[in-house]
Regions:
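PLP-dependent amino-acid enzyme catalytic core
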Residues: 1-262
Length: 262
């Protein structure tokens, strides 16, 4: 069993909307501190930091990882080098939310500008400063792997798992346990192409525009009563409704933070 509980729900209304037999939802958004896709891995990550007072992260503006870290490590300053990604009101809401956190210093600009700033600081690294991998990727972690195993035991091996892909860590963890998985790419086009080439089981190199994703997530909210984000989950659900034929049983991983009204 995992230290953090695995929340699994079955939703007949979503199944009807997607025209499939069954839909199971893995509700990572219900994990503590707002949840989200890296919540399990971050729980382990924070225990491995010694004498660290500053964490530097190059990711998207209003990063979910920075959002979670600020709660888990209230005495550590999080330096976010945030890149614009065309997220509309959701990007503005997340950016504003992080700006209001006392232990987050957020700079936002183009990918090129923020990459230069991040790498310049890394070259000048001082004791007490930790620089995360680009995008906040944490690689393999046993907690997430355990949650994947528990989910498969609960829903059965005939469910096809669908995950939103940013770094690809979750997709890799699920793919270790089953071939029945699709990772829906969510990044800007250039990164999507690179991930499509490098990540097995990835799909969705062409994603819907933001307005379409927002419309999709409003429809999902009408069905589920949940406000999930239009960037990651919006890309995932837009991908699913565009598919002419889906596996009859879907296990969808909800990996955005909870409680963000956009």
């Amino acid at each position: 069993m995992t230290t953090l509980k695995t929340h699994i729900e079955f939703d007949t209304n979503l199944a009807r909307w997607l025209n499939v037999q069954e839909v199971a939802l893995v509700r990572e958004d219900l994990l503590p501190n707002g949840g989200g896709k890296k919540r399990r891995a971050l729980a382990q990550f924070v225990t491995e930091l010694e004498d660290v007072k500053h964490i530097h992260l190059l990711s998207y503006a209003g990063s979910h990882t920075a959002y979670t870290l600020s709660s888990l490590l209230p005495d550590v300053m999080i330096h976010l080098y945030g890149t614009h990604y065309g997220g509309g009101l959701y990007e503005k809401e997340m950016t504003s939310m992080l700006d209001s956190r006392a232990n987050i210093i957020q700079k936002v600009s183009s990918s090129w500008t923020m990459s230069l700033a991040f790498n310049r600081q890394r070259r000048e690294s001082r004791p007490g400063h930790h620089f995360m991998r680009i995008g906040g990727s944490l690689g393999f972690d046993f907690s997430t792997q355990s949650a994947v195993e528990e989910t498969i035991r609960t829903v059965g091996e005939d469910f096809h798992h669908v995950v939103a892909v940013a770094s690809g860590d979750l997709l890799t963890s699920v793919a270790r346990q089953t071939n029945q998985v699709t990772g829906v790419l969510t990044q800007p086009l250039g990164i999507r192409i690179l991930k499509y080439i490098s990540l097995k089981k990835s799909s969705g190199i062409w994603k819907s525009g933001l307005n379409k994703r927002i419309k999709t997530m409003r429809a999902v909210r009408e069905i589920t009563g949940q406000t999930w984000d239009p960037i990651f989950m919006g890309t995932l659900f837009s991908y699913l409704i565009k598919k002419k034929k889906l596996p009859p049983k879907l296990c969808i991983w909800i990996t955005c933070p909870a409680g963000i009204d956009w």
